[in-house]
């Protein structure tokens, strides 16, 4: 029988993110291929652990998995392969604590990080329908004056702290642990005299304008990647630019994933009699909502496939209309009289509280006899 992602990570279904991440790190460390050379079983276990954390470590993917299982993830077009940020963090965790690196982690000769993150503001309309947007970006480029060394005349010295190794070693009992040298940040070299052009930073800042294609259905805090638009970490080589969406709220529609919510205020007589009202759809059409008699306040009605498209699949959510019953703030004499006649016409049915409350009062009186 196939194990669930929770069983693979050895956590309960109600576990929080901190517990899940802690268990993941523990298991990833235990089954890491660098610690289990030639062990195919450990390698497969390591892959399963990464797959499980890729889903449970992301709240949106976790919610899909909890509701629909793996099948739901596949149908929603959820990718389980892009966890580069976490693996880079995990790689440094392995390297600093145990003296070996995670496979696939980026080993950088340059002090310039290849990738960088930039926020992009989108209107509700731009996010829902997608758009082409020109963004102003500023990236780090290798300083030509010092060839990215950060030193005047490219003159670097061996770090005295680590003797040019980039690592220092610590002993605990019978074990020796390697740590990145703090004096040179693992480079093994230090700057004697800073470059005047970049002030020893190894890079200068350059501005550019980029035409970005925003996919239909992108949501707040979603990220998209622009390949080769990141920092120039080596001469002629650039990393990736990650854009994180900041989507403004709409006055009428509220969004949760691919579902849209809208409140429809209806008068109390409409609820009593039943009625058909027009509801605006996302694409400008009018949808007919048949309100049944005696519908309840906050009762919701769903229009399937009238929501937002998933940015990575053909799936489209629902438009959910929530009724908001409105009562008159005041009545004139004629309205008061009409309501009183209507109320009286129901007879005993118009006073349902009596059967409940009078029985309760009678019971309480019996208690004190």
From Swiss-Prot:
Residues 4-69 form the J domain. It comes from the Bacteria. Pfam families: DnaJ (PF00226), DnaJ_C (PF01556), DnaJ_CXXCXGXG (PF00684). A zinc finger (CR-type) spans 130-207. It is found in: Cytoplasm. The keyword Iron-sulfur does not apply. Zn(2+) 2 binds at residues 159, 162, 181, 184. GO terms for cellular component: cytoplasm. CXXCXGXG motif repeats lie at residues 143-150, 159-166, 181-188, 195-202. Belongs to the DnaJ family. Participates actively in the response to hyperosmotic and heat shock by preventing the aggregation of stress-denatured proteins and by disaggregating proteins, also in an autonomous, DnaK-independent fashion. Unfolded proteins bind initially to DnaJ; upon interaction with the DnaJ-bound protein, DnaK hydrolyzes its bound ATP, resulting in the formation of a stable complex. GrpE releases ADP from DnaK; ATP binding to DnaK triggers the release of the substrate protein, thus completing the reaction cycle. Homodimer. This is Chaperone protein DnaJ. It comes from Helicobacter pylori (strain J99 / ATCC 700824) (Campylobacter pylori J99).
């Amino acid at each position: 029988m196939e194990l669930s992602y929770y069983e693979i990570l050895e956590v309960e279904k109600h576990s929080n993110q901190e517990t899940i991440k802690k268990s993941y790190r523990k298991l990833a460390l235990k089954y890491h291929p660098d610690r289990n050379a030639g062990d195919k079983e450990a390698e497969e276990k390591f892959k399963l652990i990464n797959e499980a954390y890729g889903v449970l470590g992301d709240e949106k993917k976790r919610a899909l998995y909890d509701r629909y299982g793996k099948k739901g993830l596949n149908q929603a077009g959820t990718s389980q392969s892009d966890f580069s940020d976490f693996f880079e963090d995990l790689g440094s965790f392995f390297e600093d604590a145990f003296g070996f690196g995670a496979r696939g982690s980026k080993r950088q000769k340059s002090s310039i990080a290849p990738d960088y993150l930039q926020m992009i503001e989108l209107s509700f309309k731009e996010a829902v329908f997608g758009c082409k947007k020109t963004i102003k970006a500023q990236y780090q480029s290798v300083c030509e004056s010092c060839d990215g060394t950060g030193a005047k005349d490219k003159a670097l010295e061996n770090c005295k702290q680590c003797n040019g190794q980039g690592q220092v070693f610590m002993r605990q009992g019978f074990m020796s642990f390697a740590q990145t040298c703090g004096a040179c940040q693992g480079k093994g070299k230090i700057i004697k005299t800073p470059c005047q052009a970049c002030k020893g930073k190894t890079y200068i800042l350059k501005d550019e304008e980029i035409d970005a294609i925003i996919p239909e259905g992108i949501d707040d805090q979603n990220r998209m990647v622009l390949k080769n638009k990141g920092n120039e970490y080596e001469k002629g080589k650039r990393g990736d630019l990650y854009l994180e969406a900041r989507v403004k709220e709409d006055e009428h529609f509220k969004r949760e994933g691919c579902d849209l919510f809208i409140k429809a205020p209806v008068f109390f007589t409409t609820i009593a009699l039943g009625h058909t009202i027009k509801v605006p759809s996302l694409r400008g059409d009018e949808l007919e909502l048949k309100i049944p008699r005696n519908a309840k306040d906050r009762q919701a009605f769903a229009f399937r496939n009238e929501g937002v498209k998933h940015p990575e699949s053909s799936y489209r959510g629902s438009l959910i209309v929530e009724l908001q019953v409105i009562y008159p703030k005041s009545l004139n004499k004629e309205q008061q009289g009409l309501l009183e006649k209507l109320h009286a016409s129901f007879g005993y049915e118009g006073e349902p509280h009596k059967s409940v409350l009078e029985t309760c009062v009678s019971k309480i009186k019996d208690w004190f006899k």
